């Protein structure tokens, strides 16, 4: 369905939760090194429950390698500096969603590289005075919107593809 790219994730439970999200939505999770934890970390396994076998997880030595692996679809960077809401984007299968780490976000060099690859920068709106949304929550919000726009393709529940799309937001 979609590619989720995490740039240097630091907190095992966030990544574990996203493994579970990928299993439930048909997405592929791409982890860009260095990681702030070992892939066998107990907290990662606990958060991902038994979904690890159901979700494709790829590791990449660099952002360049990750972008090469997902070439072909559109690239979206989801960061607090975005000028357009994720809800205004029109997602298609094969698109890639790039997120920064929990404490540092996406470094400027990575943002420059993503822009050079044609990335569009999106933001998740939030109240003034707040810095960011939890990484696992942010990814979930965007992935479910992207999946909704595509009729929840592959969902087990019959009839979900007939759910009308929300009107375009100006």
Tell what function each PLM region has.
Residues 1-170:
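Post-transcriptional modification and biogenesis factors for structured RNAs
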